[in-house]
Amino acid sequence: MKRRFTTPTHVGNITIGGGAPIRVQSMTTTNTNDTEACVAQAKRIISAGGELVRLTTQGRREAENMKNISAALKAEGIMTPLVADVHFNANVADIAAKYCEKVRVNPGNYVDPARTFKHLEYTDEEYQAELKRIEERFVPFLNICKEHHTAVRIGVNHGSLSDRIMSRYGDTPEDIVESCMEFLRICKRENFNDVVLSIKASNTVVMVTSVRLLVKAMDKEDMHYPLHLGVTEAGEGEDGRIKSAVGIGALLSEGIGDTIRVSLSEEPENEIPVAKKLIATPTPLPLPEERGDVTDVKSENLSSPLSPSDIPSTPLSPSVPPHTVARWIKDDVLYVALNEDDADDVKLYAAMWAGAPLIDGKAHELVIYNKGEVISSSEELRVKSEEFKLREANRDCQSNGNPDSSLFTLHSSLADLSASILQAARVRFTKTEYISCPGCGRTLYDLQGTIARIKAAVSKAAETNPRFKTLKIGIMGCIVNGPGEMADADYGYVGAGPNKISLYKGKECVEKAIPEAEAVQKLLDFIEKDA
């Protein structure tokens, strides 16, 4: 894999891009005014291997306290760069730039007001005037950054695009890219080069498509700034890790990405090992871009191919009714048993195994039986062997000339994993989809506990109402991305103040300021009534 060429960006004592290693980072969830708590959490992130630590700075007090947090860490000999996360207030960015190694600004709300989903009409002259207004405010900030050797991340989130940009370009990957490019062009004109860019979305397809378009847009204008990758609001547990792997991994495998953050609704230090595994995982994909009918391919890898009478087989052609795809394992040879009624399902599972799965493990030989013929393909299948439930075969069979192979059946958890990968890639939905942010210092309720309660309540409700399995539910810490990401959700639960919650149907707020203790049940009741 050849990494995309990028110019170096200097962030404190590290470099992002320019051939430097891919950096891993996370973000604190503590109150930024609580110096002791922030330092303790930052140290946990750093001990796990984090190379940058981001903190929310929603106001002047938080921005000013970054000085104390930085001093406390440096007093212990910790020089890890700190990043201030700024939304809605350009003045806060000016303050933070004096005390942090990097400041993240959001083009969606740096000068523009928070989105209201209203369509705004602009003449060309009026729109240019809006761009001039942004430049007049952004350039003084860049000058402060130059003075203090502070880097900048231009971080666009799909959930917080401005009404201005959406009215002009629509809610598409192209408008996400343009939101970023407007600010980037100012940086280039001002010869400000310590820049990192990010485009994030909870939808992996939107995220990957937008980043690819951004790379093309930069290349067209001779820009080669480094990229920060992440799937925002990925969730927690296995689903959060899979969604992050699908989005971030797809781009890393193309050589795109200079720093990554895996956004999990968990303790921030849990994100670091996942990020490190993703960086270590991508390999060049050996499969050709154009493939013929796999049923025309024959294998010579087995000394004695088995017939259908020896082992169940399934045609991969949609014109023939499917029965079973059987796969066996011996050392580095893997056969997987499936039992799908739908030909498309068979092809999806077969394609997934023949591609490049993103789960950590060792390489195997993949063998598929089709109409009595052996179709063989060597791939690096990253699957932990303990994911398989083993059972002794009632007879020996031959595989790669070895008569000592044993039959393995596919563990149900691996089938669930396969379904989760397909859902994360937005190919097929088989369960409730959760869009949940990792939380930060802006979150004023128990986010992790709430996610667990909502999941448990929805799972129980789904036992009697299958509709719950088809829903997308957003669980957001605050309003920065909350309302915007609700546009991709059926229902939403968004923090609205200390222990207060707002409920959404799509992007429409249906009830405000609900006490946290009542909000989960109110969400369930609303979904039931809305059905």
Protein language model features and the residues they cover:
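Conserved, mostly hydrophobic/aromatic
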Residues: 24, 85, 154, 197, ...
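Short, basic, low-complexity termini and linkers enriched in Ser/Thr/Gly/Pro
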Residues: 283-320, 376-398, 402-413
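Glycine-rich tight-turn/loop motif centered on a GG-T
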Residues: 101-137, 164-174, 510-513
